[in-house]
Amino acid sequence: MSVRTVSGDVSAEVVYVNYGLIEDYAQLDSLGVSVKGKIVIARYGRSYRGIKAREAERHGAVALLMYSDPQDDGYVRGDVYPEGPMRPPAGVQRGSIFNGTGDPSTPGWPSVEGARRLADGDMPGVARIPVLGIGYGNAAELLRDIRGTAIPQAWQGGLPFRYHVGPGPVTARVMVRDDRATRGIKPIWNTVGIVQGSEYPDEIVLIGAHRDSWNAGAVDNISG
């Protein structure tokens, strides 16, 4: 799940871009591999996922798939859930790919009822290509058959076969539907509590955590 992605339906050859970082694309350039018009697949880790989306778009990719490689979070590092804490093959990391803070539709002004809002294509920091997280079980089905350019040794992950950069012969179709247009904008509420100090009543210690949640439960949001 990648929050702030756009809707899209694209089909293209797949290129493996390691972690999808600036230096990884520089390495691809040195190998003579272009991702323009391709679907790129990148490992999670070593940078914020929004940077991966930004760099994929900047280099001309039409979609980005991200997965947790078992070398970083999976059976290579220990027992997978439920026997252990590591990610199983179908486990998908969720999170935002927004490169910014606050409401991207109201950058620099309050996101209140009746506020002027930017259209999706005008929001700063929002990727304009479909971005989707997948499990390493699904990623293996793509990576196993990618051929083309040999990878630098440091790009080898933990799946039980030799990785290649591509492009081809593997193709994929990425379909993402963003239902914000049909669900609309909903209000959220903040909860504020004050414990007045006795020794330094005029000084403030501010402790906060986001109240909104990915789903049921309070582990992520209430814990900070």
Task: Please provide the spans of the model-predicted regions.
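Extracellular/luminal Protease-associated
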Residues: M1-M123, P130, A216-S223
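Soluble metallo-hydrolase cores and metallopeptidase-like ectodomains found primarily
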Residues: M1-Q27, D103-N221
